[in-house]
Amino acid sequence: MGTVSLAVQLFIVFLLTSYLLNKYSTIRKQNPIVTISTFIGWYFSLIIVFVLPLDVAITFFHKCENDRQRVLNTTSTPAPIVPECELPGGYVPDDVLFDLWRVVYWSAQILTWLILPLLQSYVTAGNFTIFGKIRAAVINNTVYYAIYSLCFLAILIYAMFKGVSINIENLKVILVSASNTWGLFLLVVLLGHGLVELPRSLWHHGNRHYRLRKTYFDIEKLASEKSEAEENVKEIYKKVRVLFNSMKNDQNGQRRKVRTILSKFSDDVIDQLFPSRQVIDNASMEEIGDYCSEAKLINLHKKTIYAVQTLNNATAQWKVLVDRALFLENLAFSESNGYNLDLARNICVPVGVRRFWYTRLQTPFCRVLGVVTVFMTFFVLFSECTFFVVSYTVSPAAFVTEYASNRFHYKYTQFVAFGIIVYLITCAYFTIFRLQIYKYYHLDPNGHTDENSILFSAILLCRLTPPICLNFLGMIHMDSHVSMAKSFGVETQFTKLMGHLDVIPILAKGINIYLPICIILLCAIHYYRVGAYVLHNIGFDQFVESDEMTNDMINSGRSLVQIERNSIKRSNERNQRNQSWTNTITSNTSTTSNAVNKYKRSRKNEEERPMLEEEEEMEEVSSTTRISLSPTEHPSSSGFFDDM
């Protein structure tokens, strides 16, 4: 029964991973290897939400059995009086859980250190053959692997100086410790951001005025990046097009390679940048001749991939921001004037329920949720700073877990552990899904994420899986070698697989000292927005309230949104006129056809009239047709105002 319950939980994670992958990427347009690798990385990273609390509950069950056996061995109390240890919900044998952890851990490690970095370089390589892309990916990652090999060698030499015997088991522990140490530093950075920004984002989400101003600012900030990306793509496309037209024959397969480069420019991109499909030739033949070599074509291909990727990211972000600004403006207008908010129909949720949510429930719900997450943030921070104190149970996470196991039943610790691990994962993964690295990494929730960004997110998630588990077990005093507690007596299956960091003394002691300090320091930096103020003062655009430059950008963003609104309005009116004009033509054509047929039938058995009278009648019919076909208003040319 426990195995079936675990299988159901894993299936739920499978559905959640499929939903997220479909939400953030276009599966049909991606390389299947990229999709499969990313899915596995995300899936194993989300599995710990259910597997780790189950491991904790089963460990408490083993502790209960050990305590019961100790009581039976040291006292003369009859066996029926000593309470039996009840199996936790979803109990599975230790070997099943251990094998599951082994698959999850080593698959995540192989993905994050070997497969995913190679795939990242593969999808961005400019080579034209599969072998060439693989070769370029290996060369690009050579420096990457060399640096990490040197770090592992340094840790190995340090362990030898400390007297650690170098055998297979210790080598595995040293390798795992080195990987987890890097993951812990990454976790500290992500938690330092997520523990502060998640409650702040929820609180601001309930403030529509703030959201609208922030959206205006982001639109103005993105406008210059989008314009720069468009100009870059235009320049590259002109060069590639002229190069393709200059090659009259396919000598050495060069024309075929240039055609491959041209295929990277989709029809949507070309229609957006060149509405009239006229490419102006600004490149001289001398400049074009430099691109005829293999190396130059590979470099041009790589630049094309990067430029198109940057433009697609900017366009996707632009559409999301403009739609958000228009919706918030409509919402504010409907509330201030007492009108009902006009919403598109949805199959799942009725319009009335959605309107009530946006106008009445969203703000108080987000504020309450923000207060709850603030409490959870202080709960986690205090636990991080006190988990190494074991003389008394000071860590709130350890205290709640122990209280649930002693006061109620140890099986309730599974629910407590589930709540804590969900918040930790939410804060860490919130940063990953919201993170934006300029022109390199951005996850778009509307399915426009490029392959490089989706692979980079899988690398981060796989790298975070073991550190999150290790940090959580230390917070609740379940890893004795982290918390230095010696009285628990049993270990989780995760700890049995991983080993302990105390094989390397500097790592074992450093976690207790530097991990809490770094998290508190980063949380303070993000809370006071030190980084934003520093970047703002040195010239980078940052959203700073009550700042003149920020207000100017907000006003500029509002003007851009108004331009987009007018453009959409003209487009809708033009479509309505065209549709009305089409319906009018269809109706008049049908009426004219019926009149002619009726005329022919009525004249079939009558005597022939004079030629002049017949000509006058046909001229009258023709004149009527011409008048009905003449539109009362001349339709505007398609896209005329949009081009302006």
Curated annotation (Swiss-Prot):
Ranges of Low complexity composition bias in the record: 578-594
Species: Caenorhabditis briggsae
Glycosylation sites: 73
Name of a matching Pfam family: LMBR1
Biological role stated in the UniProt entry: May associate with G-protein coupled receptors and regulate downstream signaling pathways.
Biased composition (Polar residues): 621-644
Protein name, UniProt field: G-protein coupled receptor-associated protein LMBRD2
Residue segments, region Disordered: 567-644
Annotated compartments: Cell membrane
InterPro entries tied to this protein: GPCR-associated_LMBR1 (IPR051584), LMBR1-like_membr_prot (IPR006876)
Key words, A-Z: Cell membrane, Coiled coil, Glycoprotein, Membrane, Transmembrane, Transmembrane helix
